[in-house]
């Protein structure tokens, strides 16, 4: 084919792509559609968003366009919601209409399918309802909200304190030990076992979970989701989700071993056995979400979300204690008054410890570890803050804009536990405290996370005083964004009390 013949073909292809682009952006001209930066043909606003620091980028766009603004990522329409009023109106008032998740094409690489979507990224429908109901009821049956699970956590807290004591007051980074302790709680719930902190396979699993979570953000990921045809290019597809694939491979080995010890005649000892029991009941039902593929994804959901979020919050907590020794001393005084230095903390103590409870909540607010939550999608046309948002629009809920709203919090960008105390020193929780999101897709692990945060945090401060190592500079209180916001690397000294 000569060059002359290629020119008309190129013109036709260009016109076709421009028409497709025009069709996808025509909703921007509809009445009351949220404002936003002008999208480029084909790419939309992909080049306008800094995916390495999305929260900051969204904050700048909010200043230009207001609390409800629009983007177009290639041909995917997106609306970003900022501030308590907009977020609550979308997720609570229109809860049924915003409970869906947008398609995430790259998850096909991990084996996602119509009946194997796990819980967190599952589309809103029968499969999600089935798995949400199963997860909540199984966690409850395994002891969530009861003494049995509380004892698991307090036992693990004792192991964590012993590991801290091994450093004999010398400087160390606490993150790895926090990951191991929180992971063992999840391992007990999902696989009925805990690991020694130096177990090589356990360490490999944790490393992959950490690296896999970083793959939840980034420019290439967003481009491949926005233009999924690019997934057919092996060189591109092979660059994403490498750690998540390796994590699932490791998890498959654990699940295979666990199946060999499962006795169907006995009551389930953990979530995996409960899932296997449901698979037996669902045999012959092609519509069931209880299948081998979904087992690994459900367990992976609980592992990845349940481990890193809680351990990151604890890492923020210890950082803020060494940066604010006056707050640390007040927490320790309350622990001494209510619990003493011998008895292990219990959830029943929390009601008598308003200051410690306020500090933990302020750690969550200030750390702001999941600033953008998880994306939602509208299942029908809705109206938010006077703007019309069409069916099929992806929603980003900027939780950071709620947790650090100047209209709600006295000192939004400072660590200030008094945000959660009234004039009489009683604990209060403002409506704008939404670290677990809100609505039908709010985090199902919230009760477990609250238990872990209280028991691990109080156990550590009961046994140790934490400080900045002598001769080292004061650590930064600024975080690092990679889907989660983690503290900048720091060391501390844990001196036994």
Swiss-Prot record:
InterPro entries: Cyt_P450, Cyt_P450_CS, Cyt_P450_E_grp-I, Cyt_P450_E_grp-I_CYP2D-like, Cyt_P450_sf, Cytochrome_P450_fam2. PROSITE patterns: CYTOCHROME_P450. Its cofactor is heme. GO terms for biological process: arachidonate metabolic process; cholesterol metabolic process; retinol metabolic process; xenobiotic metabolic process. GO terms for molecular function: anandamide 11,12 epoxidase activity; anandamide 14,15 epoxidase activity; anandamide 8,9 epoxidase activity; heme binding; iron ion binding; oxidoreductase activity, acting on paired donors, with incorporation or reduction of molecular oxygen, reduced flavin or flavoprotein as one donor, and incorporation of one atom of oxygen. It is a peripheral membrane protein. Heme binds at residue 443. GO terms for cellular component: cytoplasm; endoplasmic reticulum membrane; intracellular membrane-bounded organelle. Keywords: Cholesterol metabolism, Endoplasmic reticulum, Fatty acid metabolism, Heme, Iron, Lipid metabolism, Membrane, Metal-binding, Microsome, Monooxygenase, Oxidoreductase, Steroid metabolism, Sterol metabolism. This is Cytochrome P450 2D6. It catalyses: (5Z,8Z,11Z,14Z)-eicosatetraenoate + reduced [NADPH--hemoprotein reductase] + O2 = (8R,9S)-epoxy-(5Z,11Z,14Z)-eicosatrienoate + oxidized [NADPH--hemoprotein reductase] + H2O + H(+); (5Z,8Z,11Z,14Z)-eicosatetraenoate + reduced [NADPH--hemoprotein reductase] + O2 = (11R,12S)-epoxy-(5Z,8Z,14Z)-eicosatrienoate + oxidized [NADPH--hemoprotein reductase] + H2O + H(+); (5Z,8Z,11Z,14Z)-eicosatetraenoate + reduced [NADPH--hemoprotein reductase] + O2 = (14S,15R)-epoxy-(5Z,8Z,11Z)-eicosatrienoate + oxidized [NADPH--hemoprotein reductase] + H2O + H(+); N-(5Z,8Z,11Z,14Z-eicosatetraenoyl)-ethanolamine + reduced [NADPH--hemoprotein reductase] + O2 = N-(8,9-epoxy-5Z,11Z,14Z-eicosatrienoyl)-ethanolamine + oxidized [NADPH--hemoprotein reductase] + H2O + H(+). Substrate binds at residue 301. SUPFAM superfamilies: Cytochrome P450. The gene is CYP2D6. The keyword Transferase does not apply. Belongs to the cytochrome P450 family. It comes from the Eukaryota. It holds the Pfam family p450. It is found in: Endoplasmic reticulum membrane; Microsome membrane.
């Amino acid at each position: 084919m000569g060059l002359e013949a290629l020119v008309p073909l190129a013109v036709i292809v260009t016109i076709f792509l421009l028409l497709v682009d025009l069709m996808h952006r025509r909703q921007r001209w509809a009445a009351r559609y949220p404002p936003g930066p002008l999208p480029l043909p084909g790419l939309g606003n992909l080049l306008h968003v800094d995916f390495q620091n999305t929260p900051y980028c969204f904050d700048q766009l909010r200043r230009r366009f207001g609390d409800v603004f629009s983007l177009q990522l290639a041909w995917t329409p997106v609306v970003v919601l900022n501030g308590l009023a907009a977020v609550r109106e979308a997720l609570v008032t229109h809860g049924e209409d915003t409970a869906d998740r947008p398609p995430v094409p790259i998850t096909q690489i991990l084996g996602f399918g119509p009946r194997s979507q796990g819980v967190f990224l599952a589309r809103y429908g029968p499969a999600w309802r089935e798995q949400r109901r199963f997860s909540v009821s199984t966690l409850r049956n395994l002891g969530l909200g009861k003494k049995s699970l509380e004892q698991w956590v307090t036992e693990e807290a004792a192991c964590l304190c012993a590991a801290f004591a091994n450093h004999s007051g010398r400087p160390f980074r606490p993150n790895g030990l926090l990951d191991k302790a929180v992971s063992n709680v999840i391992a007990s719930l999902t696989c009925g076992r805990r690991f020694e902190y130096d177990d090589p396979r356990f360490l490999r699993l944790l490393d992959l979970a950490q690296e896999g979570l970083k793959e939840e953000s980034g420019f290439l990921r967003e481009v491949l989701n926005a233009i999924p045809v690019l997934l057919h290019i092996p060189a591109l597809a092979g660059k994403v989700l490498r750690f998540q694939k390796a994590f699932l491979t490791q998890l498959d080995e654990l699940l295979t071993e666990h199946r060999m010890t499962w006795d169907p005649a006995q009551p389930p000892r953990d979530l995996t056995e409960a899932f296997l029991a449901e698979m037996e009941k669902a045999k012959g039902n092609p519509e069931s979400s209880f299948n081998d593929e979904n087992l690994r994804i459900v367990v992976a959901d609980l592992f990845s979300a349940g481990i890193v979020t809680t351990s990151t919050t604890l890492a923020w907590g210890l950082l803020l204690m060494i940066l604010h020794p006056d707050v640390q001393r007040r927490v320790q005084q309350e622990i001494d008054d209510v619990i003493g230095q011998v008895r292990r903390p219990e959830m029943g103590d929390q009601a008598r410890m308003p200051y410690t409870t306020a500090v933990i909540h302020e750690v969550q607010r200030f750390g702001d570890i999941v600033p953008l939550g998880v994306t939602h999608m509208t299942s029908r046309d809705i109206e938010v803050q006077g703007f019309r948002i069409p069916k099929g629009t992806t929603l980003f809920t900027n939780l950071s804009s709620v947790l650090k709203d100047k209209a709600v919090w006295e000192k939004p960008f400072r660590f200030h536990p008094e945000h959660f105390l009234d004039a009489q020193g009683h604990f209060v929780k403002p409506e704008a405290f939404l670290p677990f999101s809100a609505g039908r897709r709010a985090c199902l692990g919230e009760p477990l996370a609250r238990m872990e945060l209280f028991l691990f945090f109080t156990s550590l401060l009961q046994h140790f005083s934490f400080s900045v190592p002598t001769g080292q500079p004061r650590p930064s209180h600024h975080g690092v964004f990679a889907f989660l916001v983690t503290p900048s690397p720091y060391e501390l000294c844990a001196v036994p009390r």
